[in-house]
């Protein structure tokens, strides 16, 4: 996992993809429709999301390991080439088969991330994240 976060900080997405098994699933829980499978698809998704970044340092707060499963709580700092910064707290589940990732599931708050991003970052994503309404009884 250390290799993954070092590669992410450098934005070496080729190295990230090499750590993933052919059947690795990568899911951002706020956007389940954007779930991808396999190293090439994972790299393409990361290239889209991290476009315009200079680096992505990550601080690990908690790491719990049990056999092939690792739970991580972390803070990412998105350093845009334009000087803007965005901080994102993330909880994640990682599963491994040998040295390869088979599952990468990130839990994070979309509004927190989108509210901090410059307008030029992924302009096709609306900045107002809809909230769920609770039906009246």
Locate the predicted segments by residue.
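Short acidic-aromatic low-complexity motifs
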Residues: 1-22, 134
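A solvent-exposed, acidic/Ser-Thr-rich amphipathic alpha-helical stretch
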Residues: 13-69
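Residue-level signal for well-ordered, solvent-exposed loop/turn and beta-edge residues enriched
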Residues: 25, 84, 100-102
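Hydrophobic/aromatic beta-strand elements that line small-molecule binding cavities or substrate pockets
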Residues: 46, 58-64, 75-77, 89-95
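Short, cysteine-centered beta-strand-loop-beta hairpins and adjacent loop/turn segments enriched
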Residues: 52, 78-87
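A short, structured loop/turn motif at beta-sheet edges
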Residues: 63-69, 95-102
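Low-complexity, intrinsically disordered terminal/linker segments enriched in charged
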Residues: 105-137
């Amino acid at each position: 996992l250390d290799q993954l976060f070092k590669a992410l900080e450098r934005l070496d997405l080729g190295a990230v993809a090499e750590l993933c098994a052919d059947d690795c699933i990568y899911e951002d829980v706020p956007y389940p429709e954007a779930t991808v499978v396999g190293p090439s698809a994972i790299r393409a998704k990361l290239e889209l999301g991290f476009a315009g970044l200079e680096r992505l340092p990550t601080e690990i707060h908690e790491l719990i390991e049990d056999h092939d499963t690792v739970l991580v709580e972390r803070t990412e700092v998105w350093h845009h080439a334009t000087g803007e910064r965005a901080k994102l707290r993330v909880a994640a589940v990682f599963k491994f088969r040998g040295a390869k990732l088979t599952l990468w599931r990130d839990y994070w708050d979309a509004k927190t991330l989108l509210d901090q991003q410059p307008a030029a970052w992924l302009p096709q994503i609306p900045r107002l994240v809809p909230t769920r309404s609770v039906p009246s009884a």
